[in-house]
Amino acid sequence: MSDLPGIVVTGASGRMGQMLMKTVLASGKARLVGAVERPGSDWVGRDAGAAMGGAAIGVTVTDDPLAAFAQAQAVIDFTAPEATVQFAELAAQARAVHVIGTTGLEPVHLERLAWAAHHAVIVRAGNMSLGVNLLTRLTQKVAEALDEDWDIEVVEAHHRMKVDAPSGTALMLGEAAARGRGVDLAQARVSGRDGITGPRAPGSIGFSAIRGGDIVGEHDVIFAAAGERITLRHVATDRAIFARGALKAALWGQDKRPGQYDMMDVLGL
């Protein structure tokens, strides 16, 4: 077992953090060697397995990420933008693969990730599932095939606790549509229409977000023309799909050169 890659999970106490730890522990392909939480968390100092309500696993939750990363070959990180860029710099120091599922990253954060990627492998994606990445590729292909008479709308739905909108996955799909059309999403994007908006701008790519209940994640890409429409859809019913994809990315990155990669690279799409 000791020759298996060691994985550290950040944001250990969160729903995704716990799912990631359980996925690593059950995989038989990697070892969970660390769990990181913010200073002041009541998880710090506890055994990660016991903190999740199970048996002890011999991994103590820490608030010292660099010490944890130094013992690992990969870090899996679904936290928040400011935390993620700090983790990226520390993972680069430790030369650990950094798998990032954090959404809501702004250009200032991406600049810091680009620096870290000079020294370590970073795999970042708005969504780690195979199905969504296939949907992304299909979205680009359909957008390439259809002209501007077909309007493009991205509609996403998530649980009530999600703090950013549109979702990272929705933006990933929008970027794919924009690439297919040969346009810049920043110029084509229209989000959250309200009030008297006037006619739809030709060539625009619209985004709508729904928040409620415990919806894991639903994404529709709608291509609408006069008299017909095409809807490409993905529904996630279990966030374990994201954890499995993240672990796949962590293992894939072990023999890669420093740089920035995404799930398309991991999946060979």
UniProtKB/Swiss-Prot annotation:
CC annotations in GO: cytosol
Location(s) in or outside the cell: Cytoplasm
EC number(s) given by UniProt: 1.17.1.8
Pathway assigned in UniProt: Amino-acid biosynthesis; L-lysine biosynthesis via DAP pathway; (S)-tetrahydrodipicolinate from L-aspartate: step 4/4
Binding positions for NAD(+) per the UniProt entry: G11, A12, S13, G14, R15, M16, E37, G101, T102, T103, A125, G126, N127, M128
Annotated residues for binding of NADP(+): R38
Alphabetized UniProt keyword annotations: Amino-acid biosynthesis, Cytoplasm, Diaminopimelate biosynthesis, Lysine biosynthesis, NAD, NADP, Oxidoreductase
Gene Ontology molecular function terms on file: 4-hydroxy-tetrahydrodipicolinate reductase; NAD binding; NADP binding; oxidoreductase activity, acting on CH or CH2 groups, NAD or NADP as acceptor
InterPro entries, per database record: DapB_C (IPR022663), DapB_N (IPR000846), DapB_N_CS (IPR022664), DHDPR_bac (IPR023940), NAD(P)-bd_dom_sf (IPR036291)
Residues annotated as catalytic: H158 (proton donor/acceptor), K162 (proton donor)
One Pfam family matching this protein: DapB_N
Record field: catalytic activity: (S)-2,3,4,5-tetrahydrodipicolinate + NAD(+) + H2O = (2S,4S)-4-hydroxy-2,3,4,5-tetrahydrodipicolinate + NADH + H(+); (S)-2,3,4,5-tetrahydrodipicolinate + NADP(+) + H2O = (2S,4S)-4-hydroxy-2,3,4,5-tetrahydrodipicolinate + NADPH + H(+)
GO biological process, one term: diaminopimelate biosynthetic process
SUPFAM superfamilies registered for this protein in UniProt: Glyceraldehyde-3-phosphate dehydrogenase-like, C-terminal domain, NAD(P)-binding Rossmann-fold domains
Signal peptide: none
Residues annotated to bind (S)-2,3,4,5-tetrahydrodipicolinate: H159, G168, T169
Record carries keyword Cell membrane: no
CDD domains named in the record: DHDPR_N
Domain of life, per lineage: Bacteria
Known role: Catalyzes the conversion of 4-hydroxy-tetrahydrodipicolinate (HTPA) to tetrahydrodipicolinate.
Family: Belongs to the DapB family.
HAMAP family the UniProt entry points to: DapB
Protein name in UniProt: 4-hydroxy-tetrahydrodipicolinate reductase
Species in which this protein is naturally found: Cereibacter sphaeroides (strain ATCC 17029 / ATH 2.4.9)
Gene designation per UniProt: dapB
